[in-house]
C-alpha cells in the first residue's frame, strides 16, 4: 500500500452502509465521518459491512470525509 503525504490514517468502525458505496464510520476518537471505498478495494470486490473495523484516510482539508483503505479480517 503506497503511503501518501499529508493524509491522516485512523482506525474506525463502520456504523452504517449508505448508497453508492458510501459508509458512515465512527473513528477511535468518537468522530463520525462519511467515507467511500478506495479504488483498489472496489476493484478486488472487498465487501464492507456494518461493524467492520477499517482504516480511514482523511485529508487535512476536510476532516468530515474520508476513504476506506483497509478492512481488518
UniProtKB/Swiss-Prot annotation:
Location (main, coarse): cytoplasm
Keyword Transport assigned: no
Domain of life: Bacteria
Family designation: Belongs to the IF-1 family.
Assembly and binders: Component of the 30S ribosomal translation pre-initiation complex which assembles on the 30S ribosome in the order IF-2 and IF-3, IF-1 and N-formylmethionyl-tRNA(fMet); mRNA recruitment can occur at any time during PIC assembly.
Matching NCBIfam families: infA
Protein name: Translation initiation factor IF-1
Organism annotation: Arthrobacter sp. (strain FB24)
